[in-house]
Curated annotation (Swiss-Prot):
<feature type="binding site">
    <location>
        <begin position="145"/>
        <end position="147"/>
    </location>
    <ligand>
        <name>substrate</name>
    </ligand>
</feature>
<keyword id="KW-0368">Histidine biosynthesis</keyword>
<dbReference type="GO" id="GO:0005739">
    <property type="term" value="C:mitochondrion"/>
</dbReference>
<dbReference type="GO" id="GO:0008652">
    <property type="term" value="P:amino acid biosynthetic process"/>
</dbReference>
<keyword id="KW-0486">Methionine biosynthesis</keyword>
<keyword id="KW-0511">Multifunctional enzyme</keyword>
<dbReference type="GO" id="GO:0004487">
    <property type="term" value="F:methylenetetrahydrofolate dehydrogenase (NAD+) activity"/>
</dbReference>
<dbReference type="GO" id="GO:0046655">
    <property type="term" value="P:folic acid metabolic process"/>
</dbReference>
<dbReference type="GO" id="GO:0004477">
    <property type="term" value="F:methenyltetrahydrofolate cyclohydrolase activity"/>
</dbReference>
<keyword id="KW-0028">Amino-acid biosynthesis</keyword>
<dbReference type="InterPro" id="IPR020631">
    <property type="entry name" value="THF_DH/CycHdrlase_NAD-bd_dom"/>
</dbReference>
<keyword id="KW-0378">Hydrolase</keyword>
<keyword id="KW-0999">Mitochondrion inner membrane</keyword>
<dbReference type="GO" id="GO:0004488">
    <property type="term" value="F:methylenetetrahydrofolate dehydrogenase (NADP+) activity"/>
</dbReference>
<protein>
    <recommendedName>
        <fullName>Bifunctional methylenetetrahydrofolate dehydrogenase/cyclohydrolase 2, mitochondrial</fullName>
        <ecNumber>1.5.1.15</ecNumber>
        <ecNumber>1.5.1.5</ecNumber>
        <ecNumber>3.5.4.9</ecNumber>
    </recommendedName>
</protein>
<dbReference type="GO" id="GO:0006164">
    <property type="term" value="P:purine nucleotide biosynthetic process"/>
</dbReference>
<keyword id="KW-0472">Membrane</keyword>
Length: 347
């Protein structure tokens, strides 16, 4: 049996009827822990009037096991073990934390990695020299430059300095262009994470209304491209009707759109941008936001998303937490891209 949530099941009801993704039929999604469950990464309080909380941490563990099997199968055939090179500039604590997590995750799935540290005053030319060397190194499968970069370095120039076939962040102009043309490409990891959450959870997209709050070229735009494009193209999309909001969208206008949305994806970097009155009953809410705010209770800094989680979870059908939602999935999709790059499946 499927899990009823506020008057509809995981596969039928307010989020629509099967087929689920594109024009294909979604696998059955059962209650957490039920035999035959498509994915067991949901956490539910057992109170049916609250949203199903999608654990990106648990889903990422499942994907990393898939990647680990893929890596070992690839190596067992006599191929070179995938190798990820990470370039980190400066001493931003958050960037160092993100990189440590990526290196740890790579090791867990059997991917070799190396960290190339550069001071914050490194020149753009020196960074391009580093990417050139890595591009030509046959042992390197994937390259990423941890963002943000110092103000004197143009991020787009550096991202385009990475060979498209090794661009595991998916930021090169060729990968972005192929994504926009519905062709196979190395997809930006955060956008891929959101898409994977939607697919594996069984959330319907075909013909549905989606709001993406945030239009960055690395996150918001790729998410919108994945969701609105044709499900029968070379790189299938979600066949959804997508509205993109941004910093100049008036709050009341945003509210009009979100109240009609079956799926709300928030990547604006504004704490509590999405409140419960902006969400319709049973909508799926995916929070990509990363914000550090002062916690008046503990007196410490805490990580929150862009959604008023405690209030919205009482109204939504699905919701991702921060932390523990899109973040772990982004790392998993980065590792998946590294394996794809090593196997030269795209290029």
């Amino acid at each position: 049996m499927t899990v009823p949530v506020r008057g509809f099941s995981l596969l039928r009801g307010r989020l629509g009827r099967a087929p689920a993704l594109g024009r294909s039929t979604a696998p059955s999604v059962r209650a957490p822990g039920e035999p035959g469950s498509a994915f067991r990464g949901f956490r539910s309080s057992g109170v049916r009037h609250e949203a199903i909380i999608i654990s990106g941490t648990e889903m990422a563990k499942h994907i990393q096991k898939e990647i680990q099997r893929g890596v070992e199968s690839w190596v067992s055939l006599g191929n070179r073990r995938p190798h990820l090179s990470i370039i980190l500039v400066g001493d931003n604590p958050a960037s160092h934390t993100y990189v440590r997590n990526k290196i740890r995750a790579a090791s867990a799935v059997g991917i070799c990695s190396e960290l190339i540290l550069k001071p914050k005053d490194v020149s753009q030319e020196e960074l391009l020299d580093v990417t050139d060397q890595l591009n030509m190194d046959p042992r390197v499968s994937g390259i990423l430059v941890q963002l943000p970069l110092p103000d004197h370095v143009d991020e787009r120039t550096i991202c385009n300095g990475i060979a498209p076939e090794k661009d595991v962040d998916g930021f090169h102009i060729i990968n972005i262009g192929r994504l926009c043309l519905d062709q196979h490409s190395l997809i930006p990891a955060t956008a891929s994470a959101v898409w994977e959450i939607i697919k594996r959870t069984g959330i319907q997209t075909f013909g549905k209304n989606v709001v993406v709050a945030g239009r960055s070229k690395n996150v918001g735009m790729p998410i919108a491209m994945l969701l609105h494009t044709d499900g029968e193209h070379e790189r299938p999309g979600g066949d959804a009707t997508v509205t993109i909001a941004h910093r100049y969208t008036p709050k009341e206008q945003l509210k009009i759109h979100t109240q009609l949305a079956d799926i709300i994806i928030v990547a604006a970097g504004i704490p509590k941008l999405i409140t419960s009155d902006m969400v319709k009953e049973g909508a799926a809410v995916i929070d990509v936001g990363i914000n550090y705010v002062h916690d008046p209770v503990t007196g410490k800094t805490k990580l929150v998303g862009d959604v008023d989680f405690e209030a919205v979870k009482k109204k939504a059908g699905f919701i991702t937490p921060v932390p523990g939602g899109v973040g772990p999935m982004t790392v998993a999709m980065l590792l998946k891209n590294t394996l794809l790059a090593a196997k030269k499946i795209i290029y």
